Every structure is written in C-alpha cells, then in structure tokens.
Amino acid sequence: MNQYHNCINYLLSKKTNLIPHGDKTFFDHMVGVYNFLRKINQPNDVCFAGLFHSIYGNEFFDAELNPSREEIKNIIGPEAESLVFKFNNTSREELWNSDNVKIKNILLANKLDI
C-alpha cells in the first residue's frame, strides 16, 4: 500500500470523517488541503504535511485526537511531521510573517478551505 493510502486509512481510523469542520468534515478538509497542494505542485513533504496539518490541534481547531509525534513521523515522514508540528504550535500571525514558503503554502491551502 502506498503512503497516501496509509495516511487515508490512518485518518479514517481516527474517525476524522465524523468530526465536523465548518460545513464539511475534518477528513474532507484535510484531503482538500492535500489536493490543493498537489495541484500547485508542492513537494511530497508539503503535501503530506497539508494532509495532516491540524492533526495535533491548534489555536483555531482541535479534534482532540492526541497522536504522538513519533506515530505521525512514521506515517508522513520526519520532514512533513516537522511542518505539521510547527503549524500546530506557532501562532498563525507568526507563521504568516515567517519566511517559510512551505508553511505559507499550507496556510494558503487551509485558508482557502478547499
């Protein structure tokens, strides 16, 4: 099974498809962010970070899934997990003001709420 399918299976095992997120589910939102990042030809680490961008919970949304960092690293890889951790543990204002283009692309995809 490929990495994308492993990620999808993990997200479904956490019942993210049953968690409301605006007018859709948390699962649909995360897949939408991933798909947007793929469409704009982002590298794999950014796309998989987008797929898991709010898995730890942040100042705007927390599904209280509480996965360990090691668990997420094993699923999406250490580079993607590092982006996810930063996304969830840094204020949005600070992220938007950073020079990190990878994070900014995830922020953009999230903001568009694809």
Locate predicted features.
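Metal-dependent phosphohydrolase cores
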Residues: M1-I114
